[in-house]
């Protein structure tokens, strides 16, 4: 048994009550939209709208993270990725993968390069800084 809900660095609502139930009932989360419609790849930074991107094609349907707070969080997460020399998308996916209540992370690659980047997350190791 599992639950399929959205979960990402920008959408952590699952952690409020549901994560505890997942662990207790051994019913893991299948996290979808782990890259928050592409916002956690960095492709929409500074107002950019790449050709054939979801935001370019479907615009108003995916504005959930285009808020002031959403954009601020995206920039802060991007800074963290850069500081630690991490690929932004991979850091975002790994965050989901490392949660004890997550069974699997559902990816949605459009290109072969995106698929390779996403698969490489399985072989990526994050360590906590020692300071």
Each model region followed by its residue ranges:
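Conserved small/polar residues in nucleotide/adenosyl-binding loops
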Residues: 124-130
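Beta/alpha (TIM)-barrel catalytic core signal, keyed to glycine-rich beta->alpha loops juxtaposed to Asp/Glu
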Residues: 1-123
């Amino acid at each position: 048994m599992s639950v399929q809900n959205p979960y990402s660095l920008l959408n952590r609502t699952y952690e409020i009550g549901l994560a505890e139930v997942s662990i207790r009932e051994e019913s893991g989360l299948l996290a979808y939209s782990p890259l928050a419609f592409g916002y956690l790849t960095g492709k929409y930074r500074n107002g950019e709208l790449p050709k054939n991107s979801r935001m370019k094609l479907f615009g108003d349907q995916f504005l959930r993270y285009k808020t002031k707070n959403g954009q601020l969080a995206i920039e802060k997460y991007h800074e963290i990725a850069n500081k630690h020399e991490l690929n932004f998308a991979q850091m975002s996916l790994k965050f989901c993968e490392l949660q004890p209540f997550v069974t699997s992370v559902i990816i949605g690659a459009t290109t072969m390069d995106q698929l390779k980047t996403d698969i490489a997350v399985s072989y990526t190791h994050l360590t906590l800084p020692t300071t």
